[in-house]
């Protein structure tokens, strides 16, 4: 990391640490590593010829650094969205730290930054960790009452704790620091009744119950001295239960009808509290009596989700199918609200999906070709967006419901075995999006030039192809090299209003990842007894730089765009023992 220009001149009144004092390159911390240990055990007891009991338990321990965040773009000085950053520099940055927060902190490499996890103003540290401790237990009892009736009960409990610290300013200046501790525990119970009737109907009916408690403690500092330095404690309890029935009826030996319906009752309650680092109340705002008096946000919804479809087995090598299905994603609350106006909940989103296609095999099963065409209608689709603060003081980020959007596309997958030991597989996807009704979301339908606005996290084209060849080494086992390539077209990570960017140099579209291709490879050796296999693998062979996600904060006044950069070229070895 090169020395930071401009740091250390006489106005500096707080020591920014090693990243400031070093005159040469230095590495003071790391991001994006992996360190996970996990285990799972299962016990099967044949209690009687008709009853099986299964017990399982798993545990995961993760102790690693935070994700590879990269500060990739800085605000445009003198523009309206630069006001907050420039005011903070004038009021806090230069007087206290002796330097403005600006593009001097952009590094040339996508894998370096000037992050530091200490706030010298408050004296707090925000550890660069991403730790998880998780365990779960489950039990299932299956009772075969008769050849036509089976009953199964599944009971499971799971809990985890996640602790992580992060900073996203790309600088040693404590502009945006958070420390989070999240806890979750859940209990589920499901009863399934399955059977066969009339010698043509396979049916399933059941009941599902879910209850969970969540909590999030956060210590956060955002533009200290201007916005907040606060401790927050949010909790949520959720209850969900459902009944369902599903059946497949063989109309003929070749034609089958599938139908089902599910009724769901979903309820959530959230409790919100806020106070300053010194323990005092934050200023009262609408929705809170005071910031330390919890605000309660309830939401309760019900949903009916039917499905119906037909499939026709033309012959042993060709299956035709057509389905209509519905679904929903439950409502909730905007994460970590900072004022009462953000306490409003958002509703469930609903989906109507139509699809049809075929599954086929050709040339004596040497080629498998499957195709699916779909058309989907979303109503009240949930979108996450940010806004410039208006006169009401509404929070920048909030989850909202859009009106209606449509998606249609095609998916094709092929698997070929043209000669002995050679396997080739490929997938192709195309999806078209159209926002037909923005509702109250503020999303744009089209830009001023008539181009349609972008769908969030939806690449238009995806394509993947891979191939492997197995070499028989006789009494030394087998050796199989494999190569894979994956392409994804341009993707936009946040929804846009028509005025947030127009793709010109002075005002570029934010939160974009251009199309890219990633190539991976591996060589696998399998022992003659197949008890052992060893893989030498390479990920991102061409060392392509791309981002798994971006969070554009320039247009909403927070002065930067940050991203989660994907790993560079990596090599590794895995060893597996089969028992």
Per-segment meaning from a language model:
Residues 140-144, 150-166, 313, 319-329, ...:
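Membrane-embedded beta-barrel scaffold of Gram-negative outer-membrane proteins
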Residues 257, 375-377, 398-496, 576-578:
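Gram-negative outer-membrane beta-barrel transporters
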Residues 59-63, 73, 157-161, 209-213, ...:
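Transmembrane beta-strands of outer-membrane beta-barrel pores
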């Amino acid at each position: 990391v090169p020395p930071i220009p401009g740091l250390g001149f006489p106005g500096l009144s707080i020591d920014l640490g090693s990243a400031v004092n070093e005159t040469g390159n230095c590495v003071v911390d790391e991001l994006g590593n992996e360190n996970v240990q996990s285990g799972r055990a299962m016990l099967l007891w044949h209690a009687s010829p008709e009853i099986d009991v299964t017990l399982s338990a798993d545990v995961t321990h993760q102790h690693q650094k935070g994700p590879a965040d990269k500060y990739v773009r800085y605000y445009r000085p003198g523009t309206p969205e630069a006001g907050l950053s420039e005011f903070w520099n004038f009021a806090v940055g230069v007087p206290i730290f002796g330097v403005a927060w600006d593009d001097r902190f952009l590094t040339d490499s996508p894998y370096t930054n000037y992050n530091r996890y200490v706030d010298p103003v408050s004296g707090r540290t925000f550890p660069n960790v991403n730790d998880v401790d998780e365990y779960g237990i489950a039990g299932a009892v299956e009772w075969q009452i008769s050849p036509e009736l089976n009953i199964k009960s599944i009971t499971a409990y799971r809990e985890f704790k996640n602790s992580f610290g992060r900073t996203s300013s790309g600088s040693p200046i404590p502009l945006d620091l958070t420390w989070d501790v999240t806890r979750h525990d859940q209990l589920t119970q499901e009863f399934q009744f399955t059977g066969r009737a009339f010698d043509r109907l396979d049916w399933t009916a059941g009941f599902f119950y879910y209850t969970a408690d969540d909590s999030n403690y956060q210590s956060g500092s955002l533009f200290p001295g201007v916005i907040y330095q606060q401790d927050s404690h949010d909790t949520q309890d959720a209850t969900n239960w459902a009944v369902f029935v599903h059946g497949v009826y063989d109309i003929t030996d070749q034609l089958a009808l599938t139908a089902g319906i599910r009724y769901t009752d979903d309820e959530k309650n959230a409790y919100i509290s806020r106070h300053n680092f010194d323990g005092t109340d934050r200023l009262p705002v609408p929705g809170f009596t005071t910031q330390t008096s919890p605000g309660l946000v309830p939401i309760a919804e019900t949903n009916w989700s039917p499905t119906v479809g037909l499939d026709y087995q033309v012959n042993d090598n060709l299956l035709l199918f057509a389905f209509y299905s519905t679904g929903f994603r439950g409502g909730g609350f905007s994460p970590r609200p900072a004022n009462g106006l953000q306490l409003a909940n958002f509703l469930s989103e609903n989906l109507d999906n139509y699809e049809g296609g075929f599954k086929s095999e050709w040339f004596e099963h040497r080629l498998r070709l499957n195709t699916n065409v779909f058309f989907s209608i979303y109503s009240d689709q949930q979108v996450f967006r940010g806004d410039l603060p208006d006169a009401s003081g509404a929070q920048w980020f909030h989850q909202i419901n859009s009106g209606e959007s449509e998606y249609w596309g095609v998916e094709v997958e092929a698997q070929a075995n043209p000669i002995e030991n050679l396997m080739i597989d490929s997938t192709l996807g195309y999806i078209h999006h159209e926002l037909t009704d923005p509702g109250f979301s503020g999303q744009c339908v089209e830009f001023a030039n008539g181009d349609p606005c972008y769908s969030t996290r939806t690449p238009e084209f995806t394509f993947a192809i891979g191939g492997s060849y197995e070499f028989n080494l006789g009494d030394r086992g087998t050796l199989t090299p494999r190569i894979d390539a994956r392409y994804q077209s341009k993707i936009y990570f946040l929804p846009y209003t028509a005025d947030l960017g127009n793709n010109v140099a002075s005002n570029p579209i934010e939160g974009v990842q251009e199309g890219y291709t990633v190539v991976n490879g591996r060589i696998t050796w399998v022992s003659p007894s197949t008890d052992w296999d060893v893989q030498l693998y390479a990920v991102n062979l061409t060392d392509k730089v791309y981002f798994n996600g971006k969070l554009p904060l320039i247009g909403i006044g927070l002065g930067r765009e940050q991203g989660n950069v994907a790993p560079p070229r990596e090599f590794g070895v895995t060893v597996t023992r089969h028992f």
